[in-house]
């Protein structure tokens, strides 16, 4: 927390010059746009407890459209499901953490992990786990498919903004 207080004091001091009378005001120092330390502070204080727009519904107009993106260093996918719903998931396989979708795609029925071929429906449900129980055995008693779907991120749509 001491680091946060230090950064907060730097921000307040710099904002005083920005908010000064127009003849005396100056812009923020360049480091405010490039500092990893300030970005971490902003992630914690600005973004973590607030809604943030990450995409538009019009980015994925058709069933099976998937938009891959990263928000605050978290890989995400935004999906238009078969029920015409929009859902947001972590873009990470639940098996070994591999990125599932490298770039946005259209008209997909499944999301397949490029590492071990685990397959998810576009609704995030785990559909298949090839050879998880050995060659030719696609099931294992310790693998509960109902518990291993993609992690959904709570989302809402407002004026086409997701």
Residue ranges and their predicted role:
Residues 60-162:
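Rieske [2Fe-2S] iron-sulfur-binding domain
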Residues 21-22, 28-71, 76:
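Non-catalytic accessory segments flanking enzyme active sites
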């Amino acid at each position: 927390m001491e680091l946060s207080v230090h950064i907060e004091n730097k921000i307040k001091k710099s904002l005083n010059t920005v908010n000064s009378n127009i003849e005396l005001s100056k812009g923020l120092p360049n480091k405010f746009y490039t500092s990893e330390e300030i970005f971490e502070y902003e992630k914690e204080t600005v973004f973590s407890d607030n809604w943030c727009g990450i995409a538009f519904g019009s980015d994925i107009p058709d069933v099976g459209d998937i938009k891959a993106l990263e928000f605050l260093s978290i890989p995400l996918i935004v999906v238009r499901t078969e029920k015409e719903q929009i859902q947001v998931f972590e873009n990470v396989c639940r098996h070994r953490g591999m990125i599932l979708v490298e770039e946005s795609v259209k008209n997909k029925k499944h999301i397949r992990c490029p590492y071990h071929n685990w397959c998810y429906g576009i609704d995030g449900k785990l559909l298949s786990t090839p050879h998880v129980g050995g060659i030719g055995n696609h099931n294992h008693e310790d693998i509960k498919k109902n518990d291993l779907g993609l992690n959904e991120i709570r989302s809402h749509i407002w004026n086409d903004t997701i």
